[in-house]
Amino acid sequence: MLVALRGAQKEMWTALPGSIVSYDASKQTAAVQTTVKARIADPKGGVDWVDVPVLVDCPILFPSGGGFTLTFPIVAGDECLVVFSSRCIDGWWQSSGVQIPPDLRIHSLSDGFVFVGPRSQPKRITPSPSATAVEIRSDDHAVYIRITADHDIEALTPGDASVTASGTITL
């Protein structure tokens, strides 16, 4: 039974790290090359390691809720994590709301959601992220907005800063 279970698990995709190949901002989808090879048996009983085909039309997940969304640029080469839905997402993706899956596939490479941001060690954020504040920052930390636990707000930019408001601005 354990052998049968392991055989079934080989066909079950859950999550894989990847690299953005291209991004379509209007559709909010990406093409992703996974960065872990797939193991397949060769005809002689050996094992080959092959690239998983590029995953296309994968929805990008931007953190959002309550009418607000955090967005950021996405470019080729950005590292990501692709999480595969346990059921076909096509009906939901096209129409929103509760849908009957148009296909009975499960854990398919066709049903991946992309979280941009997980990083391998060579591409980790340096300098390291703050351990005491929330930051919106550039990777090189040359520009940032920081909110601290002491309720302070700090902003830094080597360039110009502008604020446009239809009401009062207090600094």
Where would I find each of the regions flagged by the language model?
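Hydrophobic packing positions characteristic
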Residues: 1-159
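Short, intrinsically disordered, charge-balanced linker/junction segments flanking boundaries
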Residues: 164-171
